[in-house]
Amino acid sequence: MSKRYAVVLAAGQGTRMKSKLYKVLHPVCGKPMVEHVVDQISTLDVDKVVTIVGHGAEKVQEHLAGKSEFVKQDEQLGTAHAVLQAKSELAGKDGVTLVVCGDTPLIEASTMEALLKYHHEKRAKATILTTVIEDPTGYGRIIRDDLGIVEKIVEHKDATEKEQRISEINTGTYCFDNKALFEALENVSNDNVQGEYYLPDVIKILKDADEVVAAYKMESFEESLGVNDRIALAEASKLMQRRINENHMRNGVTLVNPENTYIDIDVKIGQDTVIEPGVMLRGKTVIGDDCVVTSGSEIVSSVIGERVHVRNSSIFESKVGDDVQIGPYAHLRPESDIHNHVKIGNYVETKKAVVGEGTKLPHFIYMGDAEIGKNVNVGCGSIAVNYDGKNKAKTIIGDNVFVGCNSNLIAPVKVGDRAFIAAGSTITKDVPEDALGIARAKQDNKLGYAKHLNHGK
């Protein structure tokens, strides 16, 4: 098999996005759109990927580190000029080169593989990826002769009335014989209104040289959708989300209302898990089998075990074991580690907290910078007081401890195994194993005093 190369065009300014963020770095379902493109290419057994960068080059290189080589296009002088910048990496090499736009996040590896195969079968010097749409306004048209052979690409503004009625369009993705590509690029002129060097002119140069130029027609226009503004970004995200959600459903996940469920592309979900409407699953979240995530929940870059029930809660960068109950209205902040058979009830917040197996935090609790053992019960209103205004300190609670309601554990503090903290206590010293910790003022009842307070009739 001949060598395969790919050039990804990612140097455009994206002025229509009206954004400080470099255009191709705008995310589509949790991943920058240029990374979608490069990740699809990387599955094609390509020998080298070269990404043409311009504005914001450093940020693009950070996202694609290890996935691509990079060449800078200092001046944006057109698509042919952009590809020519890869001359130092690819010129003179035998093989075929894919040219793909970095703002087409929906293009799939299977389509590019089919394009490569068709190019090889036709023994072409260039093959254009085309598609048919109902309204081709604004797109370059594919002009074929009576035998269906490609003659040229005509831009919409240059097309005759007859040519404008053609519905087959140029998607902007190509496959070239590598040597023929770079030889032709040297002859592309900028003799046009914009004064730019256009890649479709390479097709004309090759045709004039009597080389074979083919066109592979794909079925779906969606894959060729280019993102140039926020409206197109929203459309691409919608289409990508549908693709992601349908893939999960095919793999045994129930999405009660897929049109109202947001799932990033790198999320993994086990079989027989049920995701209700209004759920957002972001980042590299992994959810096991037989879980239920109810409406209003958000889970970000977290690992969730099996048979976990998350009710209307938020989980960020945390780990949850098996058979755990979370919520409603719980908030697991980063670095929470919840072990098996734990209950995290309503209005409970954890942060950098390890919660041991079988422990219950039923309601209205804050545990930050805490290490909690097995089979602990923490009563309503209890707090691990971890911050003194300058420094954070740790609370350690042993196994089989009972913490009564409305207790304050002033860190740093350690509560030993099987200890009992009396309700309403403010614990400032370590509590030994098997001890009762009680720290509150003695109650004093002043008989008859309430009559002088006028608090009731």
Swiss-Prot record:
SUPFAM superfamilies: Nucleotide-diphospho-sugar transferases, Trimeric LpxA-like enzymes. Residues 1-230 are annotated as: Pyrophosphorylase. Keywords: Acyltransferase, Cell shape, Cell wall biogenesis/degradation, Cytoplasm, Magnesium, Metal-binding, Multifunctional enzyme, Nucleotidyltransferase, Peptidoglycan synthesis, Repeat, Transferase. It catalyses: alpha-D-glucosamine 1-phosphate + acetyl-CoA = N-acetyl-alpha-D-glucosamine 1-phosphate + CoA + H(+); N-acetyl-alpha-D-glucosamine 1-phosphate + UTP + H(+) = UDP-N-acetyl-alpha-D-glucosamine + diphosphate. Pathway: Nucleotide-sugar biosynthesis; UDP-N-acetyl-alpha-D-glucosamine biosynthesis; N-acetyl-alpha-D-glucosamine 1-phosphate from alpha-D-glucosamine 6-phosphate (route II): step 2/2; Nucleotide-sugar biosynthesis; UDP-N-acetyl-alpha-D-glucosamine biosynthesis; UDP-N-acetyl-alpha-D-glucosamine from N-acetyl-alpha-D-glucosamine 1-phosphate: step 1/1; Bacterial outer membrane biogenesis; LPS lipid A biosynthesis. It comes from the Bacteria. In the N-terminal section; belongs to the N-acetylglucosamine-1-phosphate uridyltransferase family. Its EC number is 2.7.7.23, 2.3.1.157. One of its GO terms (cellular component) is cytoplasm. The gene is glmU. Pfam families: Hexapep (PF00132), NTP_transferase (PF00483). Its main location: cytoplasm. The lineage of its organism: Bacteria, Bacillati, Bacillota, Bacilli, Bacillales. InterPro entries: Bifunctional_GlmU, GlmU-like, GlmU_C_LbH, Hexapep, Hexapep_transf_CS, NTP_transferase_dom, Nucleotide-diphossugar_trans, Trimer_LpxA-like_sf. It is found in: Cytoplasm. The keyword DNA-binding does not apply. Mg(2+) binds at D103, N228. This is Bifunctional protein GlmU. The active site is at H363. UDP-N-acetyl-alpha-D-glucosamine binds at residues 9-12, 23, 73, 78-79, 140, 155, 170, 228, 333, 351, 366, 377. GO terms for molecular function: glucosamine-1-phosphate N-acetyltransferase activity; magnesium ion binding; UDP-N-acetylglucosamine diphosphorylase activity. Residues 252-457 are annotated as: N-acetyltransferase. It comes from Listeria innocua serovar 6a (strain ATCC BAA-680 / CLIP 11262). The keyword Magnesium applies. Residues 231-251 are annotated as: Linker. Acetyl-CoA binds at N386, Y387, A423, R440.
